Structure formats: structure tokens, C-alpha cells
Curated annotation (Swiss-Prot):
This is Enoyl-[acyl-carrier-protein] reductase [NADH]. It catalyses: a 2,3-saturated acyl-[ACP] + NAD(+) = a (2E)-enoyl-[ACP] + NADH + H(+). Substrate binds at residue 227. The gene is fabV. GO terms for biological process: fatty acid biosynthetic process. Its EC number is 1.3.1.9. NAD(+) binds at residues 49-54, 75-76, 112-113, 141-142, 246, 272-274. It comes from the Bacteria. Pathway: Lipid metabolism; fatty acid biosynthesis. Pfam families: Eno-Rase_FAD_bd, Eno-Rase_NADH_b, Enoyl_reductase.
Length: 399
């Protein structure tokens, strides 16, 4: 038991609130339920990277929107009797509790999703507990490091531009001030390493392993998540080291299309507040602006809204028609964010933002609240001065 308040260092909140995290998951489930349950979608789903952000949202949509049995893989720190674990641990525990209450199969694996050991365990569980095959594989890993399964070598990714230093207005999120951020360009080695960590190699290793074991259903589909953004963030993102990794993901999808019976696609999603996006310089300012503009235009979506739309309006359409894809074969869920009127308003606003008018011109207050929400804080229905149980156990295999 402990009384837990937020402690923020840089772009990480080092504390988490178990009750707040559970209520976050409950809210996401309720949002999905409101759209009604469909019987004509995925039935057995594997989510790699299932404990937060878009991966968690995909798992919720599959289970509570389509009654699917789900197996989730993630790397989180469990809470102990005296110390809170990571937010993802409590998210996964809450998902498991609600799914089981609904009579759905739910199992989780806590371990390194880049490892062969994780793949072997997943295959064993699919064979023994899920009827032998899965019909959807969601790949949603966002990690700064990857340990290569063959050699044990640890590779690190770099959030850097390519070619020249990147200078831009940004928010110092510790001081709530506008600063000029400058980031030196990535070396060739850093670019290659970023592709190794964040590109499609591991996604392909997963599909190859599942294929070899015969645990993919004849019409199995697989989707990996990506972000492209607009030219505001391109220097650090799409034209940076991370963009090279995401282009590798696109090429991987083309190859995987020949390896699965259904389809293999990259889904390009909108920018949302996640632990992953907070780490990208310039993103907090861009997010604060784009949220305000999209809310004003009535097209704002959260993480769960995006995945609900991806499943219902793209992948599993009620009329059975195939999803439209862009010229690279991608599912585009960033269509509303990239509308000319939205991006035009962002570009007009960008040079006007100062420390003095930051809270007035943008939804930075909303950004900060959503950031703390990720860790279970800033909820009106939680008393943060009360003791909360930090040790939460659930149906999870520890690797």
C-alpha cells in the first residue's frame, strides 16, 4: 500500500497510480462498448506491445468490440507490496480483469517481445489455449532499445534528424516555457541502429515464427503501427532516423503480404499523447496545437477512437468491402489530422506561440493533463491522498 502522487522527470513520470490506470482502461472499454458489439471481425488476436497506447487500444477494440480472445505481450515492471509498478502493468491487469468478467479469454506475457523466448511462449499458448491459430496479429512495439535474439547485442535508437541539425521552437515541459530546441543530426550508425530497433525486422521475425509453427489462420491479417505526421514534424520524424525505420516497416509490410493468407499492412495513426510521443522533441508543442485545432473543428480523436475507427471503418467493414489503402498499401487513420485546414491552422499558430500565451493559444493544459492521465493521475474520481494497493496480480506469464 502507498499514497502516490505524480513525480515528473523530463518526459517521464516516475510514479504511477494503480487505481487511476484501472479507471483509464475502464473508460476506454466503455467508449468501445458504446459503438456496439460486432460478431464479424477477428476472433483470436495476438497483440505485441499490448500494455499501453495504441497496442492496448487495439486489444480493447478486439475484445470488447468484437468479442475476440486476446493474448498480449509486453515488457512492464510489476508492482510490489511497497512500490508501484509501471502504468502498463496496471493497464494490462485491468484489461485482464474486465475481459475475464466478460467471459473472454485473456492471457498476457511479461517479457522481452524482441526475444525468441517470447515467440516460443506465444506459440505454445496459441496451440494449447487458443484453439491453435490466431487470425489477427497487431504489432505495436515502441522501444528505445532492442536486444538482438541471435547475438544478445543491445542496439539503441536515436530520435535525430538526418543531414543537418534541427532547430525548432519547443516546450520545456518541466518549466512550461517556450525554448529553441536544437538537435544534432544522426550518424550513419545511429540511422542504421534506429532501423534495427524501430523498423520491420522484428515484425517479420514474429510472422515467420508464427508461420513456421502453423499458428496463423488461413486468412490471418497483420498490422503494424506507424506515424508520418506533417512537414511541421518531418525534420525530426519522417525525414529523420525514425522515418527511415518507418519506411523499413512499409517495405516489410510488402514482403509480409506474401506470407500471410489475409493481409499485411502498416496503419498510419494520428499523433496522440503516449509515453512514446512525449519523448520526441517538438511533439508536445505540436500536439498542444493540433488538439486545440481539431477540437475546434470537431474532429479530435483519442487513442481508443483511432483504433475503433481502424477496426470498424477500415479493416472489418460491416459490408465486407476491402479497406481503401494509400499508394504504399497503408491504412490511413491520420486523414483528419492531415486535412489542409487543420495543418494550415497549425502552421499559422506555430510562430505566434510564446511562453506568455502558451496556455491561451494552445491546449497545452490538456496535453499536460493527458500526459499525467497516462500514469493514472489527474482523474477527478480518484482521491490521491488515499492509500492504494500497489501489488496487483493477474493472469500473466513472467519470462
Amino acid at each position: 500500500m502507498a499514497i502516490i502522487h505524480p513525480k515528473v522527470r523530463g518526459f517521464i513520470c516516475t510514479t504511477t497510480h494503480p487505481k487511476g490506470c484501472e479507471l483509464n482502461v475502464r473508460d476506454q472499454i466503455e467508449a468501445t462498448r458504446k459503438l456496439g458489439v460486432r460478431e464479424d471481425g477477428p476472433k483470436k488476436v495476438l497483440v505485441i506491445g499490448a500494455s499501453s497506447g495504441y497496442g492496448l487500444a487495439a486489444r480493447i477494440t478486439a475484445a470488447f468490440g468484437f468479442k475476440a480472445d486476446t493474448l498480449g505481450v509486453f515488457f512492464e515492471k510489476p508492482g510490489t507490496e511497497t512500490k508501484a509498478g509501471t502504468a502498463g502493468w496496471y493497464n494490462a491487469a485491468a484489461f485482464d480483469k474486465f475481459a475475464k468478467a466478460e467471459g473472454l479469454y485473456s492471457k498476457s506475457i511479461n517479457g522481452d517481445a524482441f526475444s525468441d523466448e517470447a515467440r516460443a511462449k506465444v506459440i505454445e499458448l496459441i496451440k494449447n489455449e487458443m484453439g491453435g491459430q490466431v487470425d489477427l496479429v497487431i504489432y505495436s512495439l515502441a522501444s528505445p532499445v532492442r536486444k538482438l535474439p541471435q547475438t544478445g547485442e543491445v542496439i539503441r535508437s536515436a530520435l535525430k534528424p538526418i543531414g543537418q541539425p534541427y532547430k525548432s521552437t519547443a516546450i520545456d515541459t518541466n518549466k512550461d516555457t517556450i525554448i529553441e530546441a536544437s538537435i544534432e543530426p544522426a550518424t550513419e550508425q545511429e540511422i542504421a541502429d534506429t532501423v534495427t530497433v524501430m523498423g520491420g525486422q522484428d515484425w517479420e521475425l514474429w510472422i515467420d515464427a508464427l508461420n513456421a509453427a502453423g499458428v496463423l489462420a488461413p486468412q490471418a491479417r497483420t498490422v503494424a503501427f506507424s506515424y508520418i505526421g506533417s512537414d511541421i514534424t518531418w525534420p525530426i520524424y519522417w525525414h529523420g532516423a525514425l522515418g527511415k525505420a518507418k519506411q523499413d516497416l512499409d517495405e516489410t509490410a510488402q514482403r509480409l503480404a506474401g506470407k500471410v493468407g489475409g493481409s499485411a499492412n502498416v496503419a498510419v495513426l494520428k499523433s496522440v499523447v503516449t509515453q512514446a510521443s512525449s519523448a520526441i522533441p517538438v511533439m508536445p508543442l505540436y500536439l498542444s496545437m493540433v488538439f486545440k485545432i481539431m477540437q475546434e473543428k470537431g474532429v479530435h480523436e483519442g487513442t481508443q477512437d483511432q483504433l475503433d475507427r481502424m477496426f470498424r471503418d477500415r479493416m472489418y467493414r460491416a459490408d465486407g468491402s476491402p479497406a481503401e489503402l494509400d499508394e504504399k498499401g497503408r491504412l490511413r487513420l491520420d486523414d483528419w489530422e492531415l486535412r489542409d485546414d487543420v495543418q494550415g491552422a497549425c502552421k499559422a499558430l506555430w510562430p505566434q506561440v510564446t511562453t506568455e500565451n502558451l496556455f491561451e493559444l494552445t491546449d497545452y493544459a490538456g496535453y499536460k493533463k493527458q500526459f499525467l492521465n497516462l500514469f493514472g493521475f489527474e482523474r477527478a474520481d480518484v482521491n490521491y491522498d488515499e492509500d492504494v494497493a500497489t501489488e496487483v496480480k493477474f493472469d500473466c506469464v513472467e519470462l
